């Protein structure tokens, strides 16, 4: 369900985008000036012509091809046709060409005139825009029988008479199409050139059409320009191929104007689209005329011109609702062709076109919905403490006091009591092993301490370094007498140097660390009486007898923290010498085993003493005077 809800706003945006193009297209801002639709019609027309055959229905097939460009301009059209004897039986093809061309000009503002020439000129149809009279003129034209010479100048004289008679007051452009099928004689050609020039002075545009045995140079000289010349090489049957091109050039009309409305008081340009703009002779002779009424007429020069359009600056509009029509002149105002389009002034501003507001009105609820969804997500995700900074700007006068420090964490619970050790660890604090003398033989052994402490410990050998006083040894007689009935895990203190010897009952790994000498104590693996040798120098070798040792540890004494490995036993006492941080591991003969060796911790750390629970059961330490050891 969540995925469908998230796609909803995007689907609405897509629908709104589909609604945006119609106002833009109505405004004309996205107009596409591509190929005219007439091109496709001409293609269809050509295909129909390819299947045309003379017969009972040949006229019907001919007229079916009259669906080309329909000129809607306002001008006068003159046909000057050659009916000399050289035309002979081809007159019917010439007539059909005229009939189809006339059908392309359907505007009621177009007047037509049919003139024939041979030895003399003849006006078959005087200039008129009446459809019935034009139809009657075509019927008369069909009945003509060609004969005589080719004197084209006679036909131009008849056309000039019509121009002077019907176009004296109204400045309407005149289009003359002069057709010939042969070459003109010299004097006829010269006379024709003079008559054609007279017609141009009256504002006429001259086109020439040559068929069969024409002279291209002659018809080009008679026409206004090479672009006004049409030549047919394949005889009269091919005249129909010139209809589309001739109609588009001869026709003078305005098809559309952009824009259709303009803002009041703002400068703008008018783009005029139409046909026949290629008939201009000079660019500076083109005039765009804007007619508001009979008394208000504004002429402007175009800024750009091509064959189908021109761009002219539009007149200033002073009030809304004004309307004007457009006329175009290609011969410096001699004649103008009118258009059926007009431009209306409107009030400019944001409310110019209400269609633009339809998408905006639809977007407003969508935007509100999106904002509400975003705000809702933010309020859900934001934790309550985030709102504190919002209250800070309100308290501007007094600075807020710093928050109180957090309460200290609760004390950690005391560690669980250590397990009860069944065998003690002896910590002997001597005066230190430093000195030149090294260690000497110690009288007695530590069996006494094991016997005093607990009955389960038997014959535990003990060791101690020599005191700072050379040749002095500790005596265990007093300790043996006073600690005959002591429980296990006692603490024994020697007041000479305040060192203590503790015997915890736990299986441990014996470790020994001695400094300031490089003596090693080798313990051979034997069932009893191993020798412990401490090498202090090359001249002295002291040995310490160890009874009933089931294992063979090694003891190394060096100037830096030394380590030695010894068998791990359940009864693993440890001797620590406080002044020099030396430790001597002791083994219990009855419970010794052989685990892997370990290294002693740094010399600055002491072995742990008895646990707090066992300290209550331990007897107070026994003080031994320093002067009682035996020598």
Curated annotation (Swiss-Prot):
Main location, first listed in the record: membrane
Cytoplasmic compartment residues: 375-631
Any one GO MF annotation of this record: metal ion binding
SMART domains noted in UniProt: VWA
Keywords carried by this UniProt record: Membrane, Metal-binding, Signal, Transmembrane, Transmembrane helix
Transmembrane segments: 354-374
PROSITE patterns the UniProt entry points to: VWFA (PS50234)
InterPro entries: Anthrax_toxin_rcpt_extracel (IPR008400), VWF_A (IPR002035), vWFA_dom_sf (IPR036465)
Region called Disordered, residue ranges: 382-413
Biased composition (Basic and acidic residues): 388-397
Residues holding a divalent metal cation: 84, 86, 150
Leader peptide range in chain numbering: 1-27
Cellular component terms (Gene Ontology): cell surface; plasma membrane
UniProt biased composition (Pro residues): 398-413
Topological domain spans for side Extracellular: 28-353
Membrane topology: Single-pass type I membrane protein
Domain VWFA, first and last residues per copy: 76-246
Database matches in Pfam families: Anth_Ig, VWA
Intracellular or extracellular location(s): Membrane
Family affiliation: Belongs to the ATR family.
Protein's name in the database: Anthrax toxin receptor-like
Gene: ANTXRL
